[in-house]
Amino acid sequence: LQVFINTVLGECWEETSVEVDKFDDEQLAHRAEHYKADLPEGVLLLTAAVDVQEDRFEVEVRGWTRNYESWGIYKTEIYGNLIKDEPWDELEEYLRTTFRFEDGRELNIAGFGMDTGGHYTNKTYKWLKLQKKRGKKAYALKGFSRPGEDVQLLHKRSVVDIKDEIKGKMVVVDKTVLYIIG
């Protein structure tokens, strides 16, 4: 029904369930938890997810506890012409950020996944391969997109080609592992 209303009628879907709470900006701001440091106590591991857009990277850092509870630690956007190396270098630098607890202890991002299913796919594969060679835990990710099939959190991984243009032709120069996620 929601798809029909949005796409066929061109109207905005409005959730009518009594379970849906509606908050204004002030109410949401009041509910936010504030910490005196980058990291709340209990975070043991940091991961990052990178979404590649046409003109930017959207990065979210999450902190994880022993029981898989997670906190959104920080979100940022890195703008630039992704055909050039500068935004990729800026992303690499950001992923080396040190985050701190209130008592001064520090934690770095342990690993990151990067969406490869949209813009700059081949460049993303190459960049991730370089990060792995530099010792980073870097994972190529793609969202599951087969209508009608059950969505699982993690699907079978696959091996994909990394290509380069050589003498005007796209040629396979390497391979990398791609993780399909739900």
Region roles according to the model:
Residues 1-47, 60:
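A contiguous, basic/glycine-rich beta-loop/short-helix subdomain that forms a polymer-engagement track
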